[in-house]
Amino acid sequence: MNAIVTHLINEQYERGNSHIFLYTKCNSAKFFQSLGFYEIARIEDKLVFMENQRKGFANYLENLTACVPKVQARQRAAAIVMNANPFTLGHQYLVEKASRENDIVHLFVVSEDKSLVPFSVRKQLVEEGVVHLPNVYCHETASYMISSVTFPSYFQENENAVIESNALLDLQIFSQIAKALGIQRRYVGEEP
């Protein structure tokens, strides 16, 4: 088994993919740890989400906290995760509402380029659309939130199990991000 996994890892490196993610069953996680993978999140009795960078997720959290003020006692911090494909007046309304109701708003723009509008354009539109809100901080989601990497389906028997696992994994990862940034609220909107 080691030889097969090593071969697959080498294939990814040859394709230019140096940051590798994987899902495994909980009882197989130690095997992948022995091959240089590190746990990001776990859904007990279901799956473990791992990466091949020892401090990949920790570095992501560190970069997030380095560019924003620390939440003080009695301050409210919120988060919004959006694709903004493209950034609309509805998106802007949600951000402005969160900005009025909180001291700090962390606005995460989905980084993965799987949308009609490229990420660089979406990010620029979002930043321009919230420039008048001094308490809003824009971040990239990287591969850790709302991406093809963070939505597992391979280990799930049915569609309901897939939906449940997606929600639980998002919750596990986001709770670590929320803790690092002092986030107490998460705003959610609906695309038309």
Question: What label would you give each PLM region?
Answer:
Residues 17-19, 29-30, 35:
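Short non-domain terminal segments
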Residues 24, 32-37, 42-192:
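Nucleotidyltransferase catalytic core that binds NTPs
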Residues 2-5, 26-30:
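Short glycine/proline-centered loop/turn elements that form peptide/ligand docking sites
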Residues 1-2, 90:
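Alpha-helical hinge/cap motifs
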Residues 4-14, 33, 99:
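A conserved short alpha-helix in the GNAT/GCN5 acetyltransferase fold that borders
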Residues 12-25:
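Conserved GNAT acetyl-CoA-binding A-motif
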